């Protein structure tokens, strides 16, 4: 059971959705990405439609949750029959080809296309997304909007799982720990072993090698 405080906190994150509902839209998807900054691995986007009026206590920006909390919330969301979500993955090769910003937009478009239900409005974290569906950019939306926060949780957990799989193929780099971000340990591994196939060749630390 969730507490009254948790319920109120969640409801405070549905204000943007309620404003859009009041304008006559009925199916609202939150959209977010993870993995723009890492030196390795794909960029992943999530799109999520939450059922109106249902409380999901604990939904928050994925970066503000512990791994345990995030995993628990991911399981709650993806196993709820009233929650609809889609995931988009854009490869390292594609990132290097079109740049990370365009790759992020592409991942978002794929995530939206992969939703099992078609939304009629999009709330997008931080980016203006050219799309045939009406959309609104929300700065720091993953901490303000419930559906964007849910999308961020689903995308983050999905990408972390992919990076753990890459660790099995390339164990020298520690992808299971830093998930491709440019930590001191990752930079040291790059210096020792050079880049592997899943490193982003267009990113400065790898491009300079």
UniProtKB/Swiss-Prot annotation:
Q: What cofactor requirement does the entry state?
A: Mn(2+); Mg(2+)
- Listed transmembrane segments: none
Q: Which Gene3D superfamilies match?
A: Ribonuclease H-like superfamily/Ribonuclease H
User: Which key words tag this protein in UniProt?
Assistant: Cytoplasm, Endonuclease, Hydrolase, Manganese, Metal-binding, Nuclease
User: Which parts of the sequence bind a divalent metal cation?
Assistant: 32-33, 125
Protein name in UniProt: Ribonuclease HII
Q: Which organism is it from?
A: Chlamydia felis (strain Fe/C-56) (Chlamydophila felis)
Q: Where in the cell is it found?
A: Cytoplasm
Which SUPFAM superfamilies does the entry link to?
A: Ribonuclease H-like
Q: What residues does the RNase H type-2 domain cover?
A: 26-209
The role this protein plays is: Endonuclease that specifically degrades the RNA of RNA-DNA hybrids.
Q: What is its EC number?
A: 3.1.26.4
Top-rank taxon of the source lineage equals Bacteria
Q: What is its main location?
A: cytoplasm
